[in-house]
Each structure stands twice: as C-alpha cells, then as structure tokens.
UniProtKB/Swiss-Prot annotation:
UniProt keyword list: Cytoplasm, Hydrolase
Classification via InterPro entries: Urease_gamma, Urease_gamma/gamma-beta_su, Urease_gamma_sf, Urease_subunit
Protein name: Urease subunit gamma
Family: Belongs to the urease gamma subunit family.
Pathway entry: Nitrogen metabolism; urea degradation; CO(2) and NH(3) from urea (urease route): step 1/1
Gene Ontology, cellular component aspect: cytoplasm
Locations listed in the record: Cytoplasm
Lineage: Bacteria, Pseudomonadati, Pseudomonadota, Gammaproteobacteria, Pseudomonadales
Amino acid sequence: MDLSPREKDKLLIFTAGLLAERRLARGLKLNYPEAVALISAALLEGARDGRSVAELMHYGTTLLNREQVMEGVPEMIPDIQVEATFPDGTKLVTVHQPIA
C-alpha cells in the first residue's frame, strides 16, 4: 500500500482517535494528545459523511466535556484546526473552545 503523506497523517489521526475512544469507553480521562485526536478524527469523519463546515464547527464542541479529560487539558486547547476533505474540496475547519 503506497500512501501519500496526507493519507498517512489522516490514518494516524484516525488510529489515535480510535485509541482515545476506547480509553474513554473504559472510563479513563483523556490527556492532551488523546483529546485532540478524538476531536480531529470525528471532524474528518464528519466531513467524509458530507456534513458542512458550520455543522462540524458546532459538532466539535459537543464531543468532550471537562469531566472526560485530565485537569488542565481544556485550557491547553483553545482551538483545533483540521484540514478536511469535503465533496466540493478541501477546507479548513476551526473549532473554538472544543472542551467546555
């Protein structure tokens, strides 16, 4: 399998996001990289499903809350930016204050 660097990045984000989902399901609090991966992977999948940028910007704020992450993590993530592929091209999705 010959993947481009962009495809490798997406695969890495997805894998890290899947690991974060499993840890969250076991009741563990997520650390910084896990929280970013979970949200980023969900945004990429949402774009693949055909959601709009505006929908994803809102959706990104609903995925995690303070009780699901380690202390200090929400303050470390003021925003998350993901370059996602939509049916009409690649767009930058920015989620401000993703963990409320």
